[in-house]
């Protein structure tokens, strides 16, 4: 694929789509949503599970994909999480200080209430571990009703309706490549 034009785009993933190139068991994959974006063969960077929504990056730039998905590159991710019941202050503090899951310790860099009823919280993490946000809350006895990734490695889904995508700006691409993001 040497010489192929590099393509970078971001999708606001809707619920019900699997983050996969081709899953024979899936009704719908995210690739259907970006199939008309370009002629180049692009791939999702990282994953959002079928029931999660929000920001998902696509590219054909293998070097950038390796950089962004490698565990040693810590990228800031912010999620808005809707829970089945109010998150107690004690549980929130525990998540901020750190909890131990089956694959090790995890803590939130920041966590805050989004709604007064305390069933919606914003959580900022740098970990790329599989289904980490859901597992944090499930470990604490909460069911996640909705999970929305609103920020990833300096990118936001601002002004992007659910199911829509856009190409990254030259500045966004340069920021990602240089690692100049939180």
Each language-model region and where it sits:
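Basic, flexible Lys/Arg- and Gly-enriched helix-loop patches that mediate nucleic-acid binding at interfaces
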Residues: 1-182
């Amino acid at each position: 694929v040497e010489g192929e034009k590099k393509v970078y785009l971001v999708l606001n993933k809707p619920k019900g789509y699997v983050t996969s190139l081709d899953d024979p068991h899936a009704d719908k994959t995210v690739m259907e949503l970006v199939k008309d974006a370009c002629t180049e063969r692009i791939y999702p960077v990282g994953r959002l599970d079928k029931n999660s929504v929000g920001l998902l990056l696509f590219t054909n730039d293998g070097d950038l994909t390796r950089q962004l998905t490698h565990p040693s590159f810590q990228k800031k991710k912010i999620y808005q999480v809707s829970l089945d019941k109010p998150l107690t202050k004690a549980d929130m503090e525990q998540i901020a200080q750190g909890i131990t899951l089956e694959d090790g310790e995890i803590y939130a860099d920041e966590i805050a209430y989004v709604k007064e009823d305390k069933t919606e919280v914003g959580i900022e993490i740098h970990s790329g571990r599989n289904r980490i946000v859901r597992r944090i809350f499930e470990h604490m006895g909460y069911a996640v009703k909705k999970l929305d990734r609103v920020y990833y490695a300096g990118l936001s889904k601002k002004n992007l309706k659910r199911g829509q995508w856009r190409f990254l700006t030259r500045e966004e691409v340069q920021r990602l490549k240089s690692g100049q993001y939180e």
